[in-house]
């Protein structure tokens, strides 16, 4: 049984939960500071409890859309010694030469071409196209259908809107 602790139970969390399930995680729980508005269960605590759940869960990831907040909790997970996975949807194409840092979430129908570098805790949303030799910094969120052209550089904590073109 693969266990996963997900930080955040808001509107993005069901997508991450489903993806984790597709990848073999069978025991998934959530920490959220507003459990009454959670989209997923079980919410077993708040973000103040991250360190205390380390003995029960060795693997954790952040499912928050806000880049700064996602990076804050990603760093806390690292500091607490959690293993932070990369979640790649089975329908995504990721080149064997791409370098994907921990905490990245790559959703359905994404294409990541040759020699791409993705920084920690970056989200590539449904249908994003990342061309060859692209560098995407840590904590970025590339939204649905966005295209990042060859050799482009996306600065850390950047949000690229749906259907945008980055050259």
What are these regions (language model features)?
Residues 8, 61-65, 114, 150:
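Small/polar loops that bind or transfer phosphate-bearing groups
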Residues 6-7, 31, 63, 143, ...:
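Short hydrophobic segments within beta-strands
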Residues 17-20, 72-76, 118:
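Short amphipathic alpha-helical segments
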Residues 8, 20, 60, 73, ...:
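Generic structural signal for conserved hydrophobic packing positions in ordered secondary structure
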Residues 35-93:
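Phosphate-bearing ligand-interacting subdomains
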Residues 86-167:
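Structural signal for interior beta-strand "rungs" in well-ordered beta-sheet cores
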Residues 11-14, 68-69, 99:
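Short alpha-helical
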Residues 1-58:
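A solvent-exposed beta-alpha-beta segment
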């Amino acid at each position: 049984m693969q266990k996963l602790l997900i930080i955040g139970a808001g509107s993005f969390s069901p997508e991450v939960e489903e993806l984790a399930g597709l990848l073999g995680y069978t025991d998934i729980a959530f920490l959220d500071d507003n459990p009454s508005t959670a989209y997923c269960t079980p919410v077993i605590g708040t973000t103040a409890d991250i360190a205390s759940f380390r003995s029960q869960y060795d693997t954790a990831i952040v499912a928050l859309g806000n880049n700064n907040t996602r990076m804050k909790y990603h760093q806390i997970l690292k500091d607490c010694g959690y293993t932070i996975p990369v979640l790649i949807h089975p329908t995504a194409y990721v080149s064997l030469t791409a370098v994907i840092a921990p905490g990245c979430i790559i959703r359905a129908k994404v294409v990541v071409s040759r020699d791409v570098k993705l920084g920690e805790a970056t989200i590539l949303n449904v249908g994003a196209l990342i061309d060859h030799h692209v560098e995407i910094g840590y904590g970025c969120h590339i939204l649905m259908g966005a295209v990042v052209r060859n050799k482009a550089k996306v600065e850390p904590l950047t949000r690229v809107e749906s259907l945008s073109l980055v050259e």
